[in-house]
């Protein structure tokens, strides 16, 4: 009987795939199903986090107030005053760029073996008060200066003539822009292209502002350390812990 039943079962299942296990495992009378659930986003409940966080406090918004234009208050309110301040800024920027180069370049040459007298910028001019006077570039046959009054008068005459020429617009008064007069003041023709000139104006102003800050730093270094900018830089690189602005500031505190 059992043998015949197994034979019938085998014949009836011939050619069919046998299902050895149910698709869903059964434990007792219940079913266990495996589901893949996505993690739920849990809100922190804090107003300082998330995409909807508070970015500005109080009545402020993401837009800057109309009166914040990046300029000092009141200095650009009057167009004439602004034009005058811009002219002064550009002129001081140019002098600062020349001065910064004059402070660094002689010291750089001296550190590389070039001998031309005193290389530190604030010590070079004081040589005129010495007994032998001041030799330009360390060469007595070039310019041998012994009178500070003569140097002052010469500088006033030369600089005054150039500045007067610039402000007056040249000998014929044809120059309309005293800051960028062009002509003889632009021998390379950099102002021929208006777009290039506009870009150069911005670069000149940015580099000039940096040079003015650099000159201020050179002044402070000379007063505090009594050394030139490159010597101060070398000392800082050799011992950053003991040669920095904070270390010198603490030495100047009362009671030190």
From Swiss-Prot:
Processing and modification events after translation: Photoregulated by reversible phosphorylation of its threonine residues.
Localization: Plastid, Chloroplast thylakoid membrane
List of residues binding chlorophyll b 1: 56
Keywords of the record: Acetylation, Chlorophyll, Chloroplast, Chromophore, Magnesium, Membrane, Metal-binding, Phosphoprotein, Photosynthesis, Photosystem I, Photosystem II, Plastid, Thylakoid, Transit peptide, Transmembrane, Transmembrane helix
TM stretches of this protein: 90-110, 142-162, 210-230
Binding, chlorophyll b 3: 147, 163
Chain positions recorded as chlorophyll a 2 binding sites: 92
Principal location class: plastid
Binding site for chlorophyll a 4: 207
UniProt: chlorophyll b 5 binding residues: 155
Molecular function via GO: chlorophyll binding; metal ion binding
Positions contributing to chlorophyll a 6 binding: 236, 245
Cofactor note: Binds at least 14 chlorophylls (8 Chl-a and 6 Chl-b) and carotenoids such as lutein and neoxanthin.
Residues at which chlorophyll b 2 binds: 94, 143, 172
SUPFAM superfamilies: Chlorophyll a-b binding protein
Pfam family, one: Chloroa_b-bind
Positions where Phosphothreonine occurs in the chain: 37
Gene Ontology cellular component list: chloroplast thylakoid membrane; photosystem I; photosystem II
Residues that coordinate or bind chlorophyll a 1: 76, 89, 209
Topology in the lipid bilayer: Multi-pass membrane protein
Binding annotation for chlorophyll b 4: 155, 166
Quaternary structure and interacting proteins, as annotated: The LHC complex consists of chlorophyll a-b binding proteins.
Its biological purpose: The light-harvesting complex (LHC) functions as a light receptor, it captures and delivers excitation energy to photosystems with which it is closely associated.
Family statement drawn from the similarity comment of this UniProt entry: Belongs to the light-harvesting chlorophyll a/b-binding (LHC) protein family.
Comment on protein domains: The N-terminus of the protein extends into the stroma where it is involved with adhesion of granal membranes and post-translational modifications; both are believed to mediate the distribution of excitation energy between photosystems I and II.
Protein's UniProt name: Chlorophyll a-b binding protein 2, chloroplastic
Organism: Glycine max
Lineage: Eukaryota, Viridiplantae, Streptophyta, Embryophyta, Tracheophyta
